[in-house]
Structures are given as structure tokens and as C-alpha cells.
Amino acid sequence: MKLKPFLPILISGAVFIVFLLLPASWFTGLVNEKTVEDNRTSLTDQVLKGTLIQDKLYESNKYYPIYGSSELGKDDPFNPAIALNKHNANKKAFLLGAGGSTDLINAVELASQYDKLKGKKLTFIISPQWFTNHGLTNQNFDARMSQTQINQMFQQKNMSTELKRRYAQRLLQFPHVHNKEYLKSYAKNPKETKDSYISGFKENQLIKIEAIKSLFAMDKSPLEHVKPATKPDASWDEMKQKAVEIGKADTTSNKFGIRDQYWKLIQESKRKVRRDYEFNVNSPEFQDLELLVKTMRAAGADVQYVSIPSNGVWYDHIGIDKERRQAVYKKIHSTVVDNGGKIYDMTDKDYEKYVISDAVHIGWKGWVYMDEQIAKHMKGEPQPEVDKPKN
């Protein structure tokens, strides 16, 4: 029997077996300071669902993490990763968030770094459209939740057993969550829970794959082509003025202050816009926000929460009135401050032009307002606009 035709298969099989047997420590060195710098605005799954890049991020003092959701990937020249520079900030912004990254997704992501968070400064952007009738959907949970981050969260030595137990209980509410037996055991009796959330062998393979994908990432940053709209040493007032100019030029097709490109999509759909499931003051999302805030306080992180508004003119038009929105805004605010967080509340600006770029995404002038508070928070400057915790 001739082996030559089978050599490629045999070689591939041998390489695969060797890969399985090699320790993850041989690969983690692929993720270094340059990898972190290269991924500041990448918003890839290796950043958002992995642990290696975020491990390095929190070992460094060069970066200021900004957590949120889909607004972080919008091509706006006033996005903090574009607008903040050495003239107005003392650290580089690092973006973490994508569509579907709501409170629980971000809470687990942050909790997986719990032991590194003490004294670390970061901003967490809260979007009002998260607070729906159903909260985090099963679909978004399946797409955005990370097994390796859950596993690393349960390995955090300084995180209390009670906090971990609360996460186990919440995770069990999702039908497709991995390793329900482990979570059930931890939720019932943490001290008797053995093994780990994922096996050592599986963890080893996932970390190796993550390291390789981080090194050879092919996806381009959604902000790669975006350039600053003002000179590097522009004042905040100059930036706001320019933001208004750009916002005005980008919203000529409608009376709602919605970006022309997005307005065209609304017109083309020819369907009545229904958002009745949003702005629910009894949304389960509030419990996830409370868990996140309590986790960050227990970890000793210096978090600036930012509550952004919606487009008030548009939401009035589609039947979700100011009173309903204000009730949710107020509860977001109280959930943060009553649980030990400080908040920059922008929700009084939901009728201000060029703060929101479509229905819900912050843009233009809204970003500049936030950029200024982020820069102040970075540098430890006074922030009279920020409400402090009540306890």
C-alpha cells in the first residue's frame, strides 16, 4: 500500500494532535502590548468574548476602557477613540461593546477581570433601549455570552461566593447556557461545587484558538476610515460647534434630527415603526444593571456610568411619550447611585439637536459631551455634572 497519497492527511492529523497536546502557555505570549494597541477599536469577538486581550488591557495603565453596545462602532468623528488625544486626555480609549452587549453581557465580561479592577478607571454607557419588556433575549445571550469569560469569572479569587452565586442563578435563566449542572450546583451550594465551569482541556484549546485568532485577525475596525473632525488642540466648545455643523449637514432629509442615511432606510421599509416593547420601567434589565453596579463597587473599580437619552422628538412621534421615557431614565439613575455608582446623566438632552444621530445612538454633539466627561474622569478633574452614590 502506497502512503504517498495519504501523506497530507497524515501530516495534518499529526499537526492537529500536537496542537491539542501543547499547553496554552505556549500561545498566550502571542498576545502582547502591540496586540492590545492594535485592537483598541477592532470590536472583534477576540476582544469582546475573549480573555487574553482584556487580561493584558487591565495589566496596562495606558488605556481607558469604554464599555457599551452598538454606538461604539458607529462611524462618528467624535467617538472617544477618535476625538480623544494627547492634548485633551492622558490615556488612549479602548472600546468594548457591540450590538446586543447589554448589562449582563458586560457584567460577566467585567467580572471575568474582577481581581484586576481595583482602582481602575473606566466608563460604562447605558442605553435606554435595553430596558425592554423581556430584557436580554435568548438570541443575544447565545450570540454574545462567552464561555471563557464565565469560566474565568468563577476563578476570580477576590470575588465573593455570594456574587458568583447570583451570576449562576441569573445564567440559569437562559435555556442554552453551557454546563447547567455546574451552575445549578453553584447556585445551590457553592462550597460543594467541584471541578470548573469548563474542563481544563477545553479551556486549554479555547485559549490557544483565541491567541492565534488575536494574532492573525482579519477583520478591520469599523472606525478604520474615520478621521478627527477638529484640530488636535481644539477646545470642547470648538468641538461642539463643529459637531453641530456636521449633524446639521447630515440630517437635511427629515424633521427628527435623524441621520439621512438611516432615515432613508426607515422610508424604504414602508412599515410602521413599532417600539412598544421598549422603555419598560419593570424591565428585567434593571436587575442586570443592579448586579453589574454592585459587582463593580465590590471590585473597587472607579466606574463612570453614562446614561444616554433617546431621540425625544422621534419617540414622541411613534407614541412613546416623554413621561414614559422619563420614568425609565429616572430608574436607571437611581439604580446606579443607590447601589454605589456615580453617573453622568445625559437624559435631559433627549430633545437637544445633534445629541442622538438616529433614534437611539449617541452621535456628534452627544459624543463631545461624553468625551469631555471621560477626559475629566481620566485625569481626576472635578465633575460637577456627575451624580455621586448615596451610600
Curated annotation (Swiss-Prot):
Disulfide-bond pairs as recorded: none
Give the Cytoplasmic compartment stretches of this protein.
Answer: 1-5
What compartments host this protein? Cell membrane
Q: Name one GO cellular component term.
A: plasma membrane
Q: Does the keyword Transmembrane helix apply?
A: yes
Report the record's Gene Ontology biological process terms.
lipoteichoic acid biosynthetic process; symbiont-mediated evasion of recognition by host antimicrobial peptide
Q: According to its UniProt record, in which pathway does this protein act? A: Cell wall biogenesis; lipoteichoic acid biosynthesis
Give residue spans on the Extracellular membrane side: 27-391
Which InterPro entries would you find in this protein's record? DltD (IPR006998), LTA_DltD (IPR023896)
According to the record, the segments passing through the membrane are: 6-26
Note the Pfam families from the entry: DltD
Alphabetical UniProt keywords: Cell membrane, Membrane, Signal-anchor, Transmembrane, Transmembrane helix
Q: Does the keyword Chloroplast apply?
A: no
Membrane topology classification: Single-pass type II membrane protein
What this chain does, per the entry, is described as:
Involved in the D-alanylation of lipoteichoic acid (LTA). Could be responsible for the transfer of DltC-carried D-alanyl groups to cell membrane phosphatidylglycerol (PG), or alternatively of D-alanine residues from D-Ala-undecaprenol phosphate to the poly(glycerophosphate) chains of LTA. D-alanylation of LTA plays an important role in modulating the properties of the cell wall in Gram-positive bacteria, influencing the net charge of the cell wall.
Which family does the record claim for this protein? Belongs to the DltD family.
Q: What is this protein called?
A: Protein DltD
